[in-house]
Amino acid sequence: MIERLRGALASASFPVMALLLLSAIVVYPLWTMLFLGAVFAYIVRPVALRINRRIPYLSVSIILAMIVVIMPLVGILVFTVDSIINSAPSLLSLAGSIHVPGAGNLQPSAENTLANLRTVLRDILSGSLNYVVAILQSVPMISLQLFVFLSSTFYFARDGKRLVGYIRTLIPEETRPFMERMASETERVLLSIFYGHFLTALAIGLMAAVGFHLLGYPYAILLGIMTGLFQLIPVIGPWAAYTPLSIYDFVTGNILRGVLVLIFGLFLSTIDIYLRPKLSGKYADIHPMIFLVGFLGGPVVWGVAGFIVGPLVLGLAYAALEAYRMESGGEEVQ
């Protein structure tokens, strides 16, 4: 037993495994940003290669592609935080001053219900504002994570092909077919998640912002962003944004706008029902429950980044299982 232990310690694999373990400990606090960097590099690289046809410097092309792809997302995030901070006092005041025509004639139970609704709305707005303030208080850590994210996106986009080639040389010959199949399935799953969920949410959010503005709602862009976020959650969808607006209009006596926003919301939901499965199923038919669990469980483990990391991790696990099923000759599930 002791001789076998000595042999294991003296073998070449022991220092390699020990160093890999130490490296994992070093990388662990930042692995979320590294993971996101690898995912965004997958999106940035094709754009950079197109730019590289006109600009002969790949590094410059990647930086320009990152500006094209990532900066709009950063702008939306900054605008959302700024809108919540600036509009929260007005919304809190509005929530406390909601007046229902004929409220004096309502039964006490109905009056209590309205009072409870005001309280819940104020609590939600206050909680959202406190959450944003808490995030802003951790600006140094966020800045570090953002730096790691941008740096990893750049280097993965520039040297990712070499990294994949290096990893391929480490894979034993007998397992390469499985790994190739897994890489193919992973690509299909990533495209399905990106086009079927994130791109659909972006389209729904943009249409919602325009529609809410035309209907005369204040903070239409913020409402559009919220609609896009709700769209990411399969079970919820855009109705979670337009239904409260419709109820508010009905309660405050603006019946016409309440009906119009309800019709507009049904239009958004119809687009969601049609567009999401059409785009997602074009690449990989992922069950909505996988995305839902990842979307809700991810933030619990990884914070705000978990909204993206959670679905991707479960999607990659699904891709690995699908590759294993196909490699072992499993039948197609109907």
Curated annotation (Swiss-Prot):
List the record's Gene Ontology CC terms alphabetically. Answer: plasma membrane
Q: What is its main location?
A: membrane
Highest taxon of source: Archaea
| Pfam families xrefs | AI-2E_transport (PF01594)
Protein name, entry field: Putative transport protein MTH_1211
Query: What sections of the protein cross the membrane?
Result: 24-44, 60-80, 84-104, 131-151, 189-209, 220-240, 255-275, 289-309
Protein family (similarity comment): Belongs to the autoinducer-2 exporter (AI-2E) (TC 2.A.86) family.
In terms of InterPro entries, this protein maps to: AI-2E-like
Topology in the lipid bilayer: Multi-pass membrane protein
Q: Can you say where in the cell this protein is located?
A: Cell membrane
The alphabetized UniProt keywords are: Cell membrane, Membrane, Transmembrane, Transmembrane helix, Transport
On whether Phosphoprotein is a keyword of this UniProt record, the answer is: no
